[in-house]
Amino acid sequence: MSAAALKVTTESRPGSRLAVTVTVPAERTKTSYEDAINSLSRSINLPGFRKGKVPRTVVIQQLGAVRIKASALETMVDGAWRDAIQQESLEPISQPELSGGFEGLLDSFTPGEAVTITLEADVAPTPKLKSTKGLKASFEPVAYDAAKVDEMLEDSRKQLATVVPVEGRAAEQGDIAVLGFKGTYSDDGSEIEGGSADSMDVDLEHGRMIPGFIEGVIGMAVGDSKTVDCQFPDDYPKEDARGRKAAFEIELKDLKTRELPELNDAFAKQASEQETLAELRQELEQRLKDDAERRQTSNRRDALIGALVEQLEVELPEALIQQESRNLLEQTAAQFAQQGMDVKSLFTPDLVRNLMQNSRPEAEERLRRSFALTALAEAEGISVEDDAVDAKIKEVKKELAADAKIDPQRLRQAVMDDLIQEQLMSWLEENSTLTEQAPAADDADDAEKPAAKKKPAAKKKTPAKSKTDAEA
């Protein structure tokens, strides 16, 4: 279909959508109808006729005028859309939707008469910033906490501990208790689903199980049995258990504890690649300092971008929101796959729908941040020189293995994105006012811990356990 013969008008719609109205002339509607008959006559199989040789009148009689009109209309709408976006140099980012529906258009469609079609599609928005300079933002500072070094060393000692049996004393906090237990709800005596076990290793640490459970076990001796009263928290994951009181019949079948290695140079060699405890401490200190600096930089950037987003005016098209939600879903699936989970069986249609819905706010936020930075680059003329990109690519390639397979175009785009991001953040730092929020405790729990390099030969292994409804 020639675009020159079409009358096309466009109208912006809310949500970054564009309505495209196309008037198809009478001769083209007639041609589309005739083409549909010819196409169907070539494909239809009727007894007594060779394929492709079915007369026109027989085709119409057998298939009916409505089916032929529908076939003609489908082809005509597709062609009109392609010609219209080419003629008007439009760049839709989603498939078009027919305004008023196909059935309504089919009822009014008469071959040989002009027809007006309106289709809608999402288009890329044009983000604007009300202001770029003089933005004010506050960020949470992150300070290095030297005490975390001792905590990390202690965690590493626990990883390398040797599990030994306890003899001659009662259970204490920090022990490993081998328990048999059965739980019932106190209000009606019903058995707690998932609240029982024949033999389960339980770390006697506060917070491991629901309130009252660990406290009830501490002080028991091997062979003892007792009933422990507990209560499920109000925010417990299973709704029917929230806030309910429960009684657990508990038997302490065995008791073990961990013998921790001494903090010395031998421990440092076992826990890391370092030769001495002093070197290990220095490594952990530097790791925590680097982590604190990284997180503070991230906090500063988040605050600046947040202030910039407040100045953003943009309508997010649904197509982009859905695509970003799918990206987040794919990232989640990839993380599960790396953990050895069967993603295909885990990601049921219902779960996918829920994840897509739940990820929508994050998807919208990510899009707003991206559009805000794009608008800033446009408004302030911030760009990256080709020489800088080439130099950075050379640096990156030096760090890659000689036989690494890379896509040159994707690498170049990634480098450009990183460099423009750095320039944009530097510009925001220079042209905004950043203040520190009130100091907060440095939550460095996510900093990497020194993984055990070697496992002690005497360390006992216990089978993996499934979580019960007594666990917090």
From Swiss-Prot:
One BP annotation, GO: protein unfolding
Q: Does Lyase show up as a keyword for this record?
A: no
Q: Which GO terms describe its molecular function?
A: peptidyl-prolyl cis-trans isomerase activity; protein folding chaperone; ribosome binding
Q: What is its main location?
A: cytoplasm
The biased composition feature labelled Basic residues covers 452-464
Note the Pfam families from the entry. FKBP_C, Trigger_C, Trigger_N
Domain PPIase FKBP-type: residue ranges: 174-261
Q: Which reactions are catalysed by this chain?
A: [protein]-peptidylproline (omega=180) = [protein]-peptidylproline (omega=0)
Q: Is Chaperone one of the keywords?
A: yes
Enzyme Commission number: 5.2.1.8
The GO cellular component terms are:
cytoplasm
Note what the entry says on domains: Consists of 3 domains; the N-terminus binds the ribosome, the middle domain has PPIase activity, while the C-terminus has intrinsic chaperone activity on its own.
Q: What does this protein do?
A: Involved in protein export. Acts as a chaperone by maintaining the newly synthesized protein in an open conformation. Functions as a peptidyl-prolyl cis-trans isomerase.
Tell me the protein's name.
Trigger factor
Originating organism: Parasynechococcus marenigrum (strain WH8102)
Q: Which gene name does the record give?
A: tig
